């Protein structure tokens, strides 16, 4: 698959342990926290283990200015004090999206990212207990996760 159009042309699987397309870009941190608190028990109940999302890399253009022979992948993997040097990747890492799956040229129009994007993967906390969550009603999963949501 090469385009978003290609992706929507294939049939969706009946069940999947993965979900794509949650956005945490917001001006309100409280809004992001509310989305995660609401979504988490639903993800556990549905058996989702991983969440994938796409992100721009807004520091890329400035970083490449002084490094004519550098590769985009080098920027995406670059760390300072163990954290990604790109501010967006650093933010997503703090929210649990620690795996960089792919670097995608022409991902979407974003000037500071030179239209590059990265595909990131995060693991749904406590998803290894999938058989337990599947056996419980959603209300019980919500009751269990509510006091733990501050850890997200």
Cite the ranges covered by each PLM segment.
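Short acidic/polar active-site loop segments enriched in Thr and Asp
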Residues: 49, 98
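A conserved short alpha-helix in the GNAT/GCN5 acetyltransferase fold that borders
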Residues: 36-45
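C-terminal "cap" of GNAT-fold acetyltransferases
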Residues: 83-90, 95, 106-142
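Conserved acyl-donor/pantetheine-binding loop and adjacent beta-alpha core of acyl/acetyltransferases
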Residues: 1-26, 31, 42, 57-85, ...
């Amino acid at each position: 698959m090469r385009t978003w159009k290609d992706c929507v042309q294939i049939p969706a699987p009946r069940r999947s342990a993965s979900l794509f397309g949650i956005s945490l870009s917001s001006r309100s941190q409280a809004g992001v926290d509310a989305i995660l608190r609401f979504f988490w028990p639903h993800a556990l109940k549905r058996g989702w283990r991983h969440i994938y999302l796409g992100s721009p890399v807004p520091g890329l253009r400035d970083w490449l200015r002084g490094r004519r022979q550098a590769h985009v992948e080098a920027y995406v993997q670059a760390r300072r004090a163990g954290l990604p040097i790109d501010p967006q990747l650093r933010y997503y890492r703090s929210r649990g999206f620690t795996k960089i799956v792919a670097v995608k040229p022409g991902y979407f129009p974003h000037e500071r990212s030179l239209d590059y994007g990265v595909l990131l993967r995060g693991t749904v906390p406590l998803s290894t207990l999938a058989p337990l969550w599947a056996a419980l009603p959603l209300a019980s999963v919500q009751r269990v996760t509510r006091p733990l949501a501050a850890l997200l």
